[in-house]
From Swiss-Prot:
Pathway: Metabolic intermediate biosynthesis; 1-deoxy-D-xylulose 5-phosphate biosynthesis; 1-deoxy-D-xylulose 5-phosphate from D-glyceraldehyde 3-phosphate and pyruvate: step 1/1. Mg(2+) binds at D164, N196. The keyword rRNA processing does not apply. PROSITE patterns: TRANSKETOLASE_1. This is 1-deoxy-D-xylulose-5-phosphate synthase. It comes from the Bacteria. Its cofactor is Mg(2+); thiamine diphosphate. Keywords: Isoprene biosynthesis, Magnesium, Metal-binding, Thiamine biosynthesis, Thiamine pyrophosphate, Transferase. Belongs to the transketolase family. DXPS subfamily. Its EC number is 2.2.1.7. One of its GO terms (molecular function) is thiamine pyrophosphate binding. One of its GO terms (biological process) is 1-deoxy-D-xylulose 5-phosphate biosynthetic process. It comes from Gluconobacter oxydans (strain 621H) (Gluconobacter suboxydans). SMART domains: Transket_pyr. The gene is dxs.
Length: 660
């Protein structure tokens, strides 16, 4: 047993899978052998994810497709792009990473998404949806241009695998629309539409399978081309009628009219779990010449082949560690309620007496805590799908007519709608409420899902109010404040995970806009100046108080303040802290250039910056990889010991560090 295989606990259990280190090892396998390989790959995926947690359901749904793609196409020269990347676990196992698959989403382990730096078989990084067709088209065009310049360079096939949810986003259609006019480079682009909701096409049957195989064959390509040439020789009106009749007939049979109108040659629907159908169809598409971009529509079942996943309502979309035999997921120890649930609770309470409250989310009703609102007030809840741009402008339209929309979106996904936030909301000063979940560092999903930039891109906008509650009680207050604020747009950001365990009041209080609070006052002689001021924005408050305890224990007076608002800043509070302390520290769970920049700007304008040692603490200027949230903040330098060290260095004193 080699060093590589010795790290695979299931090695020896799966004979076909054990023979495959890389896709080249499967290119000579028969269809029956590929079927066996798919069965073993599915079992290996279940076993691996049971030890790590992750996105299981999507991966189980594309096992046969993954095997077929790598068996038919010459990867990594041919490029396979997995949209989002939730479904890429089987792909990772087949591409030289089986020995590390049980490090998935673990510290220093494999990413939960595709990642260029991880493997040459990951030609394009992913984690956000609907990017695959644009990237794939770019690659296909680049290959064609390189081949034109260098006759020895062979064009490659580019396959973009996108789900029926992701293809609902506008970017996917922008890419398809462009593919039709992108020139001959687009001829090597194949889009595989993975439809696991059966939302587009009728059920798969033997006739559909037959037609799909027929339509992907060279004979059908040639026949269709001949028909087109004949039609062009007919008088104009007859030609148009013939073309419409042909498209109508194909649309009646296949449901592909929309994609044909966008310039794609449509094949499908195909049973995505039938290897005997997938392999010959993919071979036909691989060998097709000059047909333009192609869309292959496959029908799959999320969670396929693992009974607990098939029976679950969410098809085990995202799971924690679980028992392979029973499917029972390991529950985290009971703790305080999550920030998401606390936001939901206050919003639900307010909605009982305010029928103007409207909620909007972009395909994340459960993740944003709006599923309860959707059940209680279905007429006031809107899930717009993976369409953040539309969600924001839709909310702006609602706000323009006097209602109170809450747009609940993860911080990392709100980035996709920035122009709409600027142009459609802030510029018009419309009172849209942005509930920004997953702000800051988020743990196992890593840099692609970190909410690191919202403070930067929101605080620079005129008319925008931005709140960052420091704990669960403050989140109640922030939600209540947003409900009552009608003067313009307002946003509040809160982290992934649970609160710190504070007792919650029955309802949130409406805060004064732009006013912070002193949480702990420095102990020193009256009118004396000195010590350290820590102005914390958001959940770093707990670490700030820990740091204050350590500093105070060694004779350093410390004032800790809660900014509450990133914009507008509490100018009076900022000025008082600067005047009364030798060192002024700001700390935030956001990138450089956010809240601290507003504070230092005001200090500079008032001349107070010349009289205080100002030290901003923010996320470093790099992306922070997947890990636990605590480990990520340790890596970022935003824990109590880091605050103590920053204060001591500014004071020019030695301060002993206390253990956590």
């Amino acid at each position: 047993m080699s060093k590589k295989t010795s790290t695979i606990p299931t090695y020896g259990r799966y004979p076909e899978l054990d023979r495959v280190r890389f896709p080249a090892d499967m290119r000579n396998l028969s269809v029956d052998q590929l079927k066996q390989l798919a069965d073993e790959l599915r079992s290996e995926t279940v076993d691996a994810v049971s030890t790590t947690g992750g996105h299981l359901g999507a991966s189980l749904g594309v096992v046969e497709l993954t095997v077929a793609l790598h068996a038919v196409f010459n990867t990594p020269d041919d490029r396979i792009i997995w949209d989002v990347g939730h479904q890429a676990y089987p792909h990772k196992i087949l591409t030289g990473r089986r020995d590390r698959i049980r490090t998935l989403r673990q510290p220093e382990g494999l990413s939960g998404f595709t990642r260029r730096a991880e493997s040459e078989y990951d030609p394009f990084g992913a984690a956000h949806s609907s990017t695959s067709i644009s990237a794939g088209l770019g690659m296909a065009v680049a290959h064609h241009l390189r081949a034109e310049e260098d006759p020895s360079y062979h064009e490659r096939n580019v396959i973009a695998v996108i789900g029926d949810g992701s293809i609902s986003a506008g970017m996917a259609y922008e890419a398809m629309n462009n593919a039709a006019v992108a020139g001959p480079g687009a001829n090597r682009l194949i889009v595989v539409l993975n439809d696991n909701e059966m939302s587009i096409a009728p059920p798969v049957g033997s006739m559909s399978d037959y037609l799909s195989r027929l339509m992907s064959s060279r004979q059908f390509f040639s026949l269709r081309d001949l028909a087109g040439k004949v039609a062009k020789r007919l008088p104009g009106k007859i030609e148009r009628t013939a073309k419409r009749a042909e498209e109508y007939a194909r649309g009646m049979i296949t449901g592909g009219t929309l994609f044909e109108e966008l310039g794609f040659y449509y094949v499908g629907p195909v049973n995505g779990h039938d290897m005997s159908q997938l392999v010959p169809i993919l071979r036909n598409l691989r060998d097709a010449d000059d047909q333009g971009p192609i869309l292959l529509h496959i029908i799959t079942e999320k969670g396929r082949g693992y009974k607990p996943a098939e029976a679950a309502g969410d098809k085990y979309h995202a799971v924690s560690k679980f028992n392979v035999v029973t499917g029972e997921q390991k529950k985290a120890p009971a703790g305080p309620p999550s920030y998401t649930s606390i936001f939901s609770r206050e919003l639900m309470r307010r909605a009982k007496t305010d029928d103007k409250l409207i909620t909007i989310t972009a395909a994340m009703p459960s993740g944003t805590g709006l599923n309860a609102f959707a059940k209680a007030y279905p007429d006031r809840f809107f899930d717009v799908g993976i369409a953040e741009q539309h969600a924001v402008t839709f909310a702006a339209g609602i706000a323009s007519e006097g209602l109170r929309p809450f747009c609940a979106i993860y911080s990392t996904f709100l980035q996709r709608a920035y122009d709409q936030v600027v142009h459609d909301v802030a510029l018009q000063n419309l009172p849209v409420r942005f509930a920004i979940d997953r702000a800051g560092l988020v743990g196992a999903d890593g840099a692609t899902h970190a909410g690191a930039f919202d403070l930067n891109y929101l605080c620079c906008l005129p008319n925008m109010v931005v709140m960052a509650p420091s704990d669960e009680v403050e989140l109640l207050h922030a939600t209540a404040t947003a409900c009552e604020y009608d003067a313009g747009p307002i946003a509040f950001r809160y982290p992934r995970g649970n609160g710190i365990g504070l007792d919650l009041p029955e309802k949130g209080e409406v805060l004064e806009i732009g006013k912070g609070r002193i949480v702990r006052e420095a102990r020193r002689a009256p009118n004396a100046r000195g010590g350290v001021a820590i102005l914390s924005l958001g959940p770093r408050m707990h670490e700030s108080l820990r740091a204050a305890d350590q500093l105070a224990a060694q004779g350093v007076p410390v004032t800790v303040a809660d900014a509450r608002f990133a914009k507008p800043i509490d100018k009076a509070l900022v000025e008082d802290l600067a005047r009364q302390h030798e060192v002024f520290i700001t700390i935030e769970e956001g990138a450089i250039g956010g809240f601290s920049s507003l504070v230092v700007q005001h200090l500079a304008e008032t001349g107070l910056l010349d009289k205080v040692k100002f030290r901003p603490m923010a996320l470093p200027d790099r992306y922070i990889d997947h890990n636990t949230q605590d480990a990520q903040y340790e890596d970022a330098g935003l824990t109590a010991p880091h605050i103590v060290r920053t204060a001591a260095d500014a004071l020019g004193v030695e301060v002993a560090q206390q253990s956590a």
